[in-house]
Amino acid sequence: MARKTPIERYRNIGISAHIDAGKTTTTERILFYTGVNHKIGEVHDGAATMDWMEQEQERGITITSAATTCFWKGMDMSYPEHRFNIIDTPGHVDFTIEVERSMRVLDGACMVYCAVGGVQPQSETVWRQANKYKVPRLAFVNKMDRTGANFFKVYDQMRLRLKANPVPVVIPIGAEEGFKGVVDLLKMKAIIWDEASQGMKFNYEEIPADLAESAKEWREKMVEAAAEASEELMNKYLEEGDLSEEEIKLGLRTRTIATEIQPMLCGTAFKNKGVQRMLDAVIDYLPSPVDIPPVAGTDEDEAETTRKADDNEKFSALAFKLMTDPFVGQLTFVRVYSGVLSKGDSVYNPVKGKKERIGRIVQMHANERLEVEEIRAGDIAACVGLKDVTTGETLCDPEAIVTLERMVFPEPVIAQAVEPKTKTDQEKMGIALQRLAAEDPSFRVKTDEESGQTIISGMGELHLEIIVDRMKREFGVEANVGKPQVAYRETIRKTVEEAEGKFVRQSGGKGQYGHVVLKIEPNEAGKGIEFVDAIKGGVVPREFIPAVEKGINEAVTQGVLAGYPVVDVKVTLHFGSYHDVDSNELAFKMAAIFGFKEGCKKAGPVILEPMMAVEVETPEDYAGTVMGDLSSRRGMVQGMDDMVGGGKAIKAEVPLSEMFGYSTALRSATQGRATYTMEFKHYSEAPRNVSEAIMAARAK
């Protein structure tokens, strides 16, 4: 089967934004204009095609990034047909992991901002992730029809808060109620959309007289930005004072793909204006799979290697999302980087060391699916029949093994005990939680050995609420949840040169004998536990050293203060002794545990608590109340910014333990007019009175 669309005409893009900037509505309009949807789905009435989990329709927020394919020939049909694979990403801060995951497999992104709210806290998080994966992006300022809409203020905020370099390629005609259309700075014409045809038809008109001067200035800035792409363009611009439409597009495209600039557009998705021009900009400025560097990975011998976006290369793909589907079971969403995959092929998973067979391949259109025979480089699709693949793993040709870089997922910061309402559901709950954990790497499940309770942990209260909710809807298991518990950690502040551990049992017959001397010292934050073997002259025989390390790894699961996991400690084994007959692995493992525990007691142990970056957006009248309340929660207020539509954005760092129930408190303090977002920042030492309270609570 030959390729239907040349790979140069592929665009794998994400649409990403803060909650309520109108991202799902924007995606809906894209599906409408590209001819896939006949009736536009509105989020307001819970009918949007991309929000396909029931919960999303109820809460009006997008949780999972559904992947959809559509085609576009330009708003005036002047382009050859391009194929868009669109990944819709959630904007809520508890789902940052979803955004991170989709960024990894995208070639470009459209950042949607609200013309009234501007650059909101979540927009900054998403921007940082796009920087991390070097994703070229455009900006689309939505909701230009709303009271308080201001395109140029959002432009200033992008520069200030995101350190971005936006280059408007259109400017708005009017704003709020009077928003009519845009001035296309390349053609220097006004684009006015026809409301009766839901924006399918439009006219090019002369630029309104009151905008002529402003349009000229902004065009000048755009041409300058394009000219900086190459010496050739710069020379022509300096000689002639202008560039042709094609040259401007080329210059802007080059710099956008190099992530030096971000073309900026505007419109109102809800009123069907501006999205069509944004689709043209996706073709003009965002990269196809062949415009970006080949994907990097490692081969069987851990040597670095790359895979080009080419059908003739060996097959390689990344599984970036799992979903459980009520009809076909598990769907594994993959992004193909190289080669071709056909139905029935076998693929190899180097992380698990397993070979698996692909059953069916489906391409999603929101949650309708089309079966396809094969997928090629640049495609995004879902495979049915893979049993043992988790998010972030590579699939490749068994004859040409490659591991594409693994994604790194954050550690959960909040935990809750969960139990089924009826005892008979225990097993069903176990299966449901395992499934959900395979889908979402930032969600973990474990059994508490002492109490036998099932503990679930995740990135925030909303995250766990949604998990419990999905258990009920998708698996029919109703559960009771305990009070949220903070995931504290322990570490040390001093170095202990000699921490001795001995395990001796000698009472006739074969005994036990293990003896180690450890140096225990603080490690850099985030480095974890490091074990160093510095034994000289065989005082501890080689074969027992892994047992010592095993002992350390076991000992760090429970700290000496309150039994929380120990982090960021470096342990060096530098001396010890053994007995020819009585020494064995168990004895050395036990000696290491005793030595580590003793050493920690002397090494200035402390409790660490998770600190959260909190940002509250509030009307100015309540700013003082909000800041006072954050301080009373042991928060450090770090700054206050003005927001585009009035009001203040307050940034603070607050311990997670003080943030439970914050949404209710904030609502009542500000009469429901303030909103907040919160994400994990880092662990920091808990003050003494807090540590004592934590220890007392654990001792009960």
Swiss-Prot record:
Record: residues binding GTP: 17-24, 88-92, 142-145
For this protein, the record's HAMAP family field holds: EF_G_EF_2_B (MF_00054_B)
Tell me yes or no: is Nucleotide-binding among this UniProt entry's keywords.
yes
From the Swiss-Prot or TrEMBL record, state where the protein is found: Cytoplasm
Q: What superkingdom does the record give?
A: Bacteria
Q: What does this protein do?
A: Catalyzes the GTP-dependent ribosomal translocation step during translation elongation. During this step, the ribosome changes from the pre-translocational (PRE) to the post-translocational (POST) state as the newly formed A-site-bound peptidyl-tRNA and P-site-bound deacylated tRNA move to the P and E sites, respectively. Catalyzes the coordinated movement of the two tRNA molecules, the mRNA and conformational changes in the ribosome.
List cellular component terms (GO).
Answer: cytoplasm
Domain (tr-type G) ranges = 8-290
PROSITE patterns for the chain = G_TR_1 (PS00301), G_TR_2 (PS51722)
> What coarse category fits the chief subcellular location reported for this protein?
cytoplasm
Annotated Gene Ontology MF terms?
Answer: GTP binding; GTPase activity; guanosine tetraphosphate binding; translation elongation factor activity
Gene, per the UniProt record = fusA
- A GO biological process held by the record: ribosome disassembly
Family, per entry? Belongs to the TRAFAC class translation factor GTPase superfamily. Classic translation factor GTPase family. EF-G/EF-2 subfamily.
- UniProt keyword Cytoplasm, yes or no: yes
Protein name, per record: Elongation factor G
Q: Which InterPro entries match?
A: EFG_II, EFG_III, EFG_III/V, EFG_IV, EFG_V, EFG_V-like, EFTu-like_2, G_TR_CS
Could you tell me the keywords of this UniProt record? Answer: Cytoplasm, Elongation factor, GTP-binding, Nucleotide-binding, Protein biosynthesis
